[in-house]
Design a protein with these regions (language model features):
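Residue-level recognition of short, solvent-exposed, well-ordered loop/turn junctions
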Residues: 23, 115, 131-133, 239
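Structural signature of FAD isoalloxazine-binding scaffolds in flavoprotein oxidoreductases
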Residues: 99-116, 132
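N-terminal accessory regions of nucleic-acid-interacting proteins
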Residues: 145-160
Length: 251
């Protein structure tokens, strides 16, 4: 179940959605305090706890905990994770394919989700060619159904980091990517949801064992983020707390 199961109101094509209004620069996290998951806002070296959650009107609880030593969880539990493939031209070329003429969409199940520090149990008995894909993940802040790109952008709560782990051998073997990209733990997410950033100017960098492997920017997307979101909502409603992975650069 999503952390924000109740719709915040529909978003018509000419009406801005009722997304939670938060100051730009806010960084939301989910963490474990006293053995239970809670929401908070990063404030310097502390997390200021809030209730109930960022997808509706929230308030500080008055309690603060130190970031150091805190167990951070995936910053949201979405009803669905939607992803777009081959959304960087250099990555499409790297994969030996043509640039899509429309967003290439697929789903990852909720069981793919992991927190930012959680270990990944790679299915090495199934695949010997498991690869990383660093991506910008968009966290939806309002119910979006059949909306324009402008309305879709206004319905974004913020962005976080994702790794769209992929079994390349299975991706080549099957035309549907559910098995290649939907295995348990294939979507590490977090650590924070950052608000107020320019969706068209986000840098994407991926390191593997200290080596920089990917370095791109959302300015190079084939389909920009508002366009991707609007395209999804033509057929599938996005709910508050849903996550959209926006593509990976070459590397």
């Amino acid at each position: 179940m999503s952390d924000a199961p109740d719709a915040l109101g529909s978003a018509g094509a000419s009406t801005a959605p009722a997304a939670a209004q938060v100051p730009p620069g806010t960084r939301f996290v989910r963490c474990v305090v006293d053995g239970a998951p809670v929401w908070g806002v990063i404030d310097g070296t502390d997390v200021a706890l809030i209730e109930p959650h960022p997808f509706t009107r929230f308030a500080p609880t008055g309690r603060r905990v130190a970031v150091e030593g805190l167990r951070l969880l995936a910053p949201v539990i979405p009803s669905k994770i939607v992803a777009v493939g081959k959304n960087y031209r250099d990555h499409a070329a790297e994969m030996g394919g043509e640039v899509p003429t429309e967003p290439l969409l697929f789903l990852k199940p909720s069981t793919a989700l992991l927190g930012p520090g959680d270990p990944v149990a790679l299915p090495v008995d199934v695949s010997d060619e498991i690869s990383y894909e660093g991506e910008v993940a968009v966290v939806i802040g309002a119910l979006l159904s059949r909306v324009t790109p402008e309305v879709a952008a206004a319905g974004v709560l913020g962005v976080t980091c994702a790794n769209d782990l992929t079994m390349r051998d299975w991706q080549r073997r099957e035309s549907q990517w559910f098995r290649a990209k939907g295995f348990d733990g294939s979507c590490p997410l977090g650590p924070a949801i950052a608000t107020g950033l320019d969706l068209g100017a986000l840098r994407v960098r991926t390191w593997v064992d200290g080596d920089l492997r990917q370095d791109g920017t959302t300015a190079d997307l084939v389909f920009d983020i508002p366009t991707v979101l609007a395209e999804i909502t033509r057929t599938t409603t996005l709910l508050p707390g849903d996550v959209v992975l926006t593509g990976t650069p070459a590397g």
